[in-house]
Amino acid sequence: PIGCADCHDAETMNLTITRPALIEAYERMGKDITQASHQEMRSLVCAQCHVEYYFDKNIEEGSQYLVFPWDNGFTAEEMEKYYDDIEFSDWTHALSRAPMIKAQHPGYETYLTGIHANRGVSCADCHMPYISEGGQKFTNHKMTSPLEYVSSSCQVCHREETEELIQSIYRNQDRVMETRLILERLLVRAHVEAKTAWDLGATEEQMEEILVGIRHAQWRWDYAVAAHGASFHSPLEISRLMGTAIAIAQETRLNLSRVLSELGLNEEVPYPDISTKEKAQEFIGLPMEQMHEEKEEFLKTVVPRWEEIAAEREAAWDVDVNMGSE
């Protein structure tokens, strides 16, 4: 669970950074995070977790060291170059054999490319707006969608009616989703066509550029999709990113068609029926029965132990659990 000490100094209650990965990422970029303004800190405390990251197994022996891949910059392309330069991949795709990167949740990075960040608006301004109670003004620590309290988040700056503000956000989401669905169809076809090429005897040399294209196109898709709220935070950047992914995916499929032709296939690649989740799982060979059993075992054994440890820890806290209750 997230507590006060994750974001606040225990003595002064000033905002503070407690995650080494964020401090180290700033240092590698030649920046001193201790010089950040209070307004910047109202977003940086969020950036301790709501970011893209990976675990480096080579920094400390026997451990997976948390790293933010910002050495080249905050954009998807700059992080892609970082991963390419160190030849990092999270997994190899079972169909295409492409070395894939799994985006985490680059919320802070996509926020930086949006209009609100450009205007100096922080994460807390919208997600933790000021409220008053008992004659005191303080930030709302119910961190959720600003649409739950439009009057104290959006309408501090915007004068439109509540419903119009909400609908404008939904319209952006719908438009981004249109592009996302087009890209997803192209990515699936690229993976299937790559598998067909391998099955027909394609060589590593023939597939090298193709696998890079699949990797880059899907990274952009995953980056856009995993950045929860990105269609609001930065709709133009997310649309641009998926547009470049569509171009890369199509160019990759064009290269694939040439390879397939060289291998003797001059017709459309047979496409599987993946119209349902179950059919897609079956096509890629997921052992769903085994996975369901493993999840049930996890819920029966691991989760109760977590809850037990949490209860033991909280029982030792010297606090009045009824403080503030009516």
Regions found by a protein language model. Name each.
Residues 1-125, 129-302:
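Primarily the internal scaffold of c-type cytochrome electron-transfer domains
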Residues 311-326:
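Extended, compositionally biased alpha-helical segments that mediate assembly or anchoring
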